[in-house]
């Protein structure tokens, strides 16, 4: 199933439908997306060239979509930064209070670590047991200093958008 960000949700909906209509007792479903694979995880062969001729914006990146929506509905950069800051604060408070403890199953994995000084790479054992992409130290001043990804006059920055990650 290739539904980009909604792939996991799509497979869960398909599983639920199968349980309801086909009488399956139990189905395991889920998904992951990849931002590190060129093309955002979409193999070139999965993009229909004929469809692109008819609807060239069909595979538009979310950054472009977000900038268009912000422009259309007059959602200012400052408002987006304020919302982002509040979201960071809420996430930090929820993590501090262990609100997600029962929602995340710890997973053992391997992680590549790159030494910033020497650029030496190593692989280490790692346990993922929490969302790690939030930044509780975020400030309005810090957010305001970030340049928009698509250049001056645009809205989306590394501080007011979701992180780029595989998962």
Describe the residue ranges of each PLM region.
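Conserved catalytic cysteine-centered active-site region
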Residues: 1-25, 45, 56-64, 136-163
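A glycine/threonine-rich phosphate-anchoring loop and its flanking beta-alpha core
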Residues: 41-78
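Short acidic, glycine/serine/threonine-rich loops at helix termini
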Residues: 37-43, 118-119
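N-terminal extracellular/periplasmic Venus flytrap/periplasmic-binding protein-like
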Residues: 82-167
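Generic structural motif
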Residues: 35, 66, 110-114
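Active-site-proximal alpha-helical scaffold in enzymes
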Residues: 3-32, 70-99, 167
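Residue-level recognition of conserved structural "scaffold" positions that shape functional pockets
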Residues: 15, 37-38, 105
């Amino acid at each position: 199933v290739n539904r980009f960000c909604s792939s996991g949700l799509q497979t869960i909906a398909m599983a639920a439908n199968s349980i309801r209509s086909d009488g399956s007792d139990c189905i395991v479903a889920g998904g992951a997306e990849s931002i590190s694979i060129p093309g955002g995880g979409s193999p070139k062969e999965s993009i229909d060239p004929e469809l692109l001729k008819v609807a060239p914006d069909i595979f538009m990146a979310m950054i472009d979509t977000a900038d268009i929506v912000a422009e259309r509905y007059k959602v200012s950069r400052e408002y987006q930064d304020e919302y982002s800051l509040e979201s960071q604060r809420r996430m930090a408070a929820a993590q501090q209070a262990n609100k997600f403890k029962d929602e995340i199953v710890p997973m053992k994995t391997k992680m590549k670590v790159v030494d910033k000084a020497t650029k030496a790479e190593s692989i280490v054992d790692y346990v993922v047991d929490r969302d790690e992409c939030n930044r509780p130290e975020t400030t309005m001043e810090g957010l305001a200093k970030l340049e928009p990804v698509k250049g001056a006059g645009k809205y989306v920055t590394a501080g007011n958008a979701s992180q780029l990650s595989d998962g």
